[in-house]
Amino acid sequence: MAPIDPDPPDFGVSGGSGSRFSRFQLPCGSAGPSGVTVPEPEGSAAAHFNPKIILVTGGCGFIGSNFVRHVVENHPGVHVTVLDKLTYAGRRENIAGLPSDRVELVVGDICDAGLLDELVPECDAVVHCAAETHNDSSIADPEPFLHTNVEGTFRLLEAVRKHGVRCRHVSTDEVYGDLALDDPARFTEESPYRPSSPYSSTKASSDMLVRAWTRTYGLRTTISNCSNNYGPYQHVEKFIPRQITNIIDGVRPKLYGDGRNVRGWIHVDDHSSAMWEILTRGRCGETYLIGADGERSNIDVLRAILVAMGKGADDFDRVPDRPGHDRRYAIDASKLRRELGWRPTHTDFSEGLRSTIDWNLTHEPWWRPAKAATEARYAGRGR
């Protein structure tokens, strides 16, 4: 099978010059959807859903591309169409090497209603990963977050409603706000929404749109809210890869504030497997929280990275904290485990961290082009 070329000039591109999108048409199986399932009655156990053609929005981003790889590697009968705008965080290289008879890349904007009208009816389900996700960037310039996260979700829901296609909406635990460091509570599916940043407020808005369209129009949707991800193909602006690549460059890592902020960490492979279980076995209209019980403070994670890379545990610099920096996230994923039997497999955080360090050490050509510009943005914000 021929792989996807990271820079595919020879692919057939539909639309002439001035076309609103570029479609890299790779050989694939059937051209149309493989069938539409009947919505489950509210509250009933879900029948097994077997999609043959999936549209993954944001499929060249971190979470989206890892999910695409998971599908290709574990579900051989499924064809994936990736829709991605290829912003700074979405790159062709993230899906390079995947079989061209299984994966098709369409370059375009999630807010393009006409494009969605072409793509959505061709698939059995949409897995909606497209989002702007970096908190610091949302504080500096919220507008792209409103455009992609809110308007983009609205446009997608309208296409899903028009064409009767199932939607798997991917979201974050940040919509719930934060918990006190000494609070033993964890977020559940019933926790109230209290977003505290421009980013999390746009994701909360997108979740609410999904719920409203589901109730009003009877859409077949599921929502998942996941804890912090780490693993391969994560942009260097994010906490773990930023620290790793700074150490590789001989630069002292930077820690916001007192570093006691707690996050629940999950390997992106485990997130991908949970996303698939919810897509194929989750009950329509339901929300599922995804987490791996990996709560750790930022300072503990940074020290673990430093020690694993042969540095002193305190070989870092403190920088001013981010405005409104949430203190603690913690997820109770018992519903997902109880109803769908899902369990994380990357339960040794030290081992997962080591593999992530090794990946960045061996993939410098992947992250190097974005490093200087990323650090320049951080420096401009005093961080």
Kindly give the residue locations of the regions a language model identified:
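Amphipathic alpha-helical recognition patches that constitute DNA-binding helices
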Residues: 62, 197, 231, 238, ...
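Hydrophobic alpha-helix immediately C-terminal to the catalytic Tyr-X-X-X-Lys motif of short-chain
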Residues: 205, 209, 213, 243, ...
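Residues in well-ordered alpha-helical elements
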Residues: 114-117, 136, 143, 154, ...
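Short aromatic-enriched loop/helix-cap "lid" or pocket-rim segments at secondary-structure transitions
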Residues: 92-95, 117, 179-183, 234-237, ...
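Structural element of the ATP-grasp superfamily
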Residues: 156, 210, 243, 336-337
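N-terminal Rossmann-like NAD(P)+-binding domain of SDR-like oxidoreductases, especially those catalyzing
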Residues: 2-229, 359-365, 369, 373-383
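The catalytic Tyr-centered alpha-helix of NAD(P)H-dependent dehydrogenases
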Residues: 184, 195-202, 232, 236-240, ...
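C-terminal substrate-binding subdomain of Rossmann-fold SDR/epimerase-dehydratase oxidoreductases
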Residues: 31, 38, 44-47, 54-55, ...
